[in-house]
């Protein structure tokens, strides 16, 4: 019965960061650090603060997600890492070195260590897949033999060996993004910045690209910083996430923790599309008080991930007594933690509504009596 009721999503979770540090010992120290970072722009309406007092550390080898509403400062933040944006105040440290002190030559070398992929691919339409990937190496003066070896390796990594003579117009969106990823890796970077890299792709292609990014992170030990408005992308691939609002950090933590128990209103709003809303049909029938003796108590149970095991639904239903009906919901695993929500209707129990809620609290981290239905 439990298997039939419980919906579990196999999210192909990214390997635990602890596991990756065994393969890459250098992962146990902070790679990128923002210290009191601020960025302002002069606009027609006056000075606009894009970033305010950002203090944040990203561990080497981590897949780190950045989310927030439009204009929250996400792109401004990651563009300070390769110095495409000059901070107004504060510092950006990479491997404990303040990059604000770099001269032009050191900045060029830094930018080669930082790959970047974009929403709109930015491929050259008149060049083939091979030529698009090769171009940064050509510009850098890399000898032809080395260029060919590197391009061949990268096209194999992203699965485009058979498309090396194709032009961008002949590629799907996912294939174009794979070219973009290959091009971003030509200089063997140790940081990869992803700015809405999957937002122009369909769900199936998004999964494919995320799988590729996971593989790159695992094999190469890259630090990946990922901006997205798609919360499912954060859930799928990231180790930790930070939420920005008006240029400030309003929440951060492990993905399972933020998703399971969002504290800030912005986080709650952004996560709302992933939550199970109360069905309209149920809302129309819900009553504050029971209208008859055979009315069912409607309970909402939330699992926030503080315990790693999935709830034993058979034991839960038996403890509630009476006839228990699952109205909606499911439980999924994120980073090894069980998260989700169940809506239950309980009829014919010897327990009253408050007693049912307390009993359900032995299995769920949050329980609520929503009302009664007949």
Curated annotation (Swiss-Prot):
Cell inner membrane is among the record's keywords: yes
Q: EC?
A: 7.4.2.11
User: Pfam families, from UniProt?
Assistant: ABC_tran, NIL
The domain of life for this entry's organism is Bacteria
User: Does Lipoprotein appear among the keywords?
Assistant: no
Name the keywords, alphabetized.
Amino-acid transport, ATP-binding, Cell inner membrane, Cell membrane, Membrane, Nucleotide-binding, Translocase, Transport
Membrane topology, record value: Peripheral membrane protein
GO CC terms for this protein? plasma membrane
Subcellular locations according to the entry: Cell inner membrane
* Primary role: Part of the ABC transporter complex MetNIQ involved in methionine import. Responsible for energy coupling to the transport system.
Full protein name: Methionine import ATP-binding protein MetN 2
């Amino acid at each position: 019965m439990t298997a039939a009721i419980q919906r579990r999503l196999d999210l192909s979770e990214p390997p635990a960061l602890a596991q990756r540090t065994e393969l890459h010992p250098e992962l146990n120290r902070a790679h990128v650090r923002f210290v009191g970072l601020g960025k302002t722009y002069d606009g027609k309406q006056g000075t606009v603060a894009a970033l305010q007092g950002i203090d944040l550390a990203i561990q080497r080898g981590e897949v780190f997600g950045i989310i927030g509403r439009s204009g929250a400062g996400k792109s401004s933040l990651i563009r300070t890492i390769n110095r495409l944006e000059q901070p107004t105040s504060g510092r950006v440290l990479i491997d404990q070195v303040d990059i604000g002190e770099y001269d032009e030559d050191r900045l060029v070398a830094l930018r080669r260590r930082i790959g970047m992929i974009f929403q709109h691919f930015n491929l050259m339409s008149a060049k083939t897949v091979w030529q698009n990937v090769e171009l940064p190496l050509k510009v850098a003066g890399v000898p032809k033999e080395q260029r060919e070896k590197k391009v061949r390796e990268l096209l194999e990594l992203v699965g485009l060996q058979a498309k090396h003579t194709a032009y961008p117009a002949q590629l799907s969106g996912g294939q174009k993004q794979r070219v973009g990823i290959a091009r971003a890796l030509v200089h063997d970077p140790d940081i990869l910045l992803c700015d809405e890299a999957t937002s122009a792709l369909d769900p199936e292609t998004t999964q494919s690209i995320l799988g590729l990014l996971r593989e790159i992170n695992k094999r190469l030990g890259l630090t990946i910083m990922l901006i997205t408005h798609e919360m499912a992308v954060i859930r799928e691939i990231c180790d930790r996430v930070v939420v920005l609002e008006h240029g400030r950090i309003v929440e951060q933590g492990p993905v399972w923790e933020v998703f399971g128990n969002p504290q800030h209103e912005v986080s709650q709003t952004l996560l709302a599309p992933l939550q199970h809303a109360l069905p309209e049909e149920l809302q129309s029938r819900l009553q504050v008080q029971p209208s008859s003796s055979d009315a069912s108590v409607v309970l909402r149970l939330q699992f926030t991930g503080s315990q790693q095991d999935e709830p034993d639904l058979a034991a839960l239903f038996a403890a509630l007594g009476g006839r228990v009906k699952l109205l909606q919901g499911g439980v999924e695993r994120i980073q090894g933690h069980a998260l989700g929500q169940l809506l239950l209707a309980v009829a014919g129990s010897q327990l009253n509504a408050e007693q049912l809620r307390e009993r359900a609290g032995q299995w769920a981290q949050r329980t609520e009596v929503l009302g009664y239905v007949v």
